[in-house]
Curated annotation (Swiss-Prot):
SUPFAM superfamilies: MurD-like peptide ligases, catalytic domain (SSF53623), MurD-like peptide ligases, peptide-binding domain (SSF53244). Binds 2 Mg(2+) ions per subunit. This is Folylpolyglutamate synthase. The modification N6-carboxylysine is found at residue 185. The gene is fpgS. Mg(2+) 1 binds at residues 73, 143. GO terms for biological process: one-carbon metabolic process. Involved in the conversion of folates to polyglutamate derivatives, and likely functions in the retention of cellular folate pools. Catalyzes successive MgATP-dependent additions of glutamate to a pteroylmonoglutamate substrate, with a high preference for 5,10-methylenetetrahydrofolate (mTHF). Thus, metabolizes mTHF to the tetraglutamate derivative, but longer glutamate chain length products are not observed. Tetrahydrofolate (H4PteGlu) and 10-formyl-H4PteGlu are poorer folate substrates. In contrast to E.coli FolC, this enzyme does not display dihydrofolate synthase activity. GO terms for cellular component: cytoplasm. Optimum pH is about 10. The lineage of its organism: Bacteria, Bacillati, Bacillota, Bacilli, Lactobacillales.
Length: 428
């Protein structure tokens, strides 16, 4: 297979399985020599912020001299971004070879059991674990797909577990309450393994407290055990002070905006420090400073054009939209235009309501390239917004009607990805 055929093969697997357990991926991993049982891992979950935190953790540990694998989803520009080593995406040739190897293992299993198969995410996760072992990374930072306990990534014993926050999202899979969702996410907490979390809402904190009581895990919580006592905008980024029991690190800079990124970066620092302590690896304040300064993360309040001023953001649930609105009010004193595309399996009504209440000009558009896109009929019910056939049409209307207003495109990482690929290069 060539590269295009390889990516098409990966996407040919079913998206969901009838049962949410680890039997399929463990069977495939066993056929690959159980790479997930070898090496060191950091496991990261959370409704929002897990990608930003995982990215920053990897950058900080890379700055300390470690070779770091990073497994995330979804990709923004190219599939290869999902499996990176020292922030270099897996090369095309390496991806082709790795997929061929994992495919051969899968086909051997299917010769023994004709109806055996895995989901797309299970295949990619097994691929990531195998590739990281082949490249002998020092540590791999693994971002959960959805939830935690039954997620395909949850087949490892990490050095440290991370839970950024708990909010309502993926309710059909995880449940309709904070408590239910928190129980899924707390499923990555392992016996005796430290866990670093955000300042969780009370219902989620109660779940984690009960979990660590049974696992005997050390629990390090934002705003209790570590904090950001001081922060301010610094260009299109932030400068802040981090504090924990070891003292303060001042004037840290990160190229990310939004108050919630202060929490994510603090979680990343604390996680890296816990990892270093657990593995007796030297980690200096300068490593932390250098790693955070490099922690750009695409499609997270990312400015992709100055003239016109265009920002893309992957906020995809009501909690994420709340954080986005707060950040935009801090960033801009003038009116802004919002272009929002939301998936049908999200709480699109609440998201659209919050955006239209906060901003006078909101265009609603379909998310391209995914069967999960909200159909036009769903948008028509949201009468406050202006329905457009595409984000390109909404962008053109905004540039024509209010050419001097900043434009923010949000609602889904899939939409942010499509916009970024088109405006910054890649497929149209």
């Amino acid at each position: 297979m060539n590269y295009t055929e390889t990516v098409a093969y990966i996407h040919s697997f079913p998206r969901l399985a009838k049962t949410g357990d680890h039997r399929r991926i463990l069977t495939l991993l066993h056929a690959l020599g159980n790479p997930q049982q070898q090496g060191r891992y950091i496991h990261v979950t959370g409704t929002n912020g897990k990608g930003s935190a995982a990215n920053a953790i990897a950058h900080v540990l890379e700055a300390s001299g470690l070779t770091v694998g990073l497994y995330t989803s979804p990709f923004i520009m190219r599939f290869n971004e999902r499996i990176m080593i020292d922030h270099e995406p897996i090369p095309d040739a390496a991806l082709v070879n790795a997929v061929a190897f994992v495919r051969a293992a899968l086909e051997r299993l299917q010769q023994q059991q004709a109806d055996f198969n895995v989901t797309e995410f299970e295949f990619i996760t097994a691929l990531g674990y195998w590739y990281f072992r082949q490249r002998q990374v020092d540590v791999a930072v693994i971002e959960v797909g959805i939830g935690g306990d039954t997620d395909s990534t949850n087949v490892i014993t990490p050095v440290v577990s991370v839970l950024t926050e708990v909010a309502l999202d993926h309710q059909k899979l995880l449940g309709h309450t904070i408590t239910a969702i928190a129980k899924h996410k707390a499923g990555i907490i392992k016996r005796g393994i430290p866990v670093v979390t955000g300042n969780l809402v009370p219902d989620a904190a109660a779940v984690v407290a009960a979990k660590v009581a049974t696992t005997g895990s050390q629990w390090l919580r934002f705003d209790r055990d570590f904090s950001v006592p001081k922060a301010k905008l610094h260009g299109w980024g932030q400068r802040f002070t981090y504090e924990d029991q070891d003292g303060r690190i001042s004037d840290l800079e990160v190229p990310l905006v939004g108050d919630y990124q202060q929490r994510n970066m603090a979680i990343a620092i604390q996680t890296a420090k816990v990892y270093a302590k657990q593995t007796e690896w030297p980690l200096t304040p300068q490593n932390i400073r250098q790693g955070l300064a490099a922690s750009h993360w695409p499609a997270r309040l990312e400015k992709i054009s100055d003239t016109p001023l265009i920002v893309i953001d992957g906020a995809h649930n009501p909690d994420g939209i709340n954080g986005l609105i707060t950040a935009l009010k801090q960033l801009f004193s003038q009116p802004i235009t919002v272009i929002a595309g939301i998936l049908a399996d999200k709480d699109y009504a609440a998201m659209a309501d919050r955006l239209t209440a906060a901003f006078s000009t909101v265009y609603l558009v379909p998310v391209p390239g995914t069967p999960r896109a909200l159909p036009e009929a769903g948008y028509e019910a949201l009468h406050e917004g202006r329905l457009k056939d595409s984000w390109q049409e909404a962008l053109a209307a905004s540039l024509n009607d209010v050419p001097d207003q900043p434009i923010v495109i949000t609602g889904s990482l899939y939409l942010a990805s499509a916009v970024r690929q088109t405006l910054l290069g890649g497929k149209s």
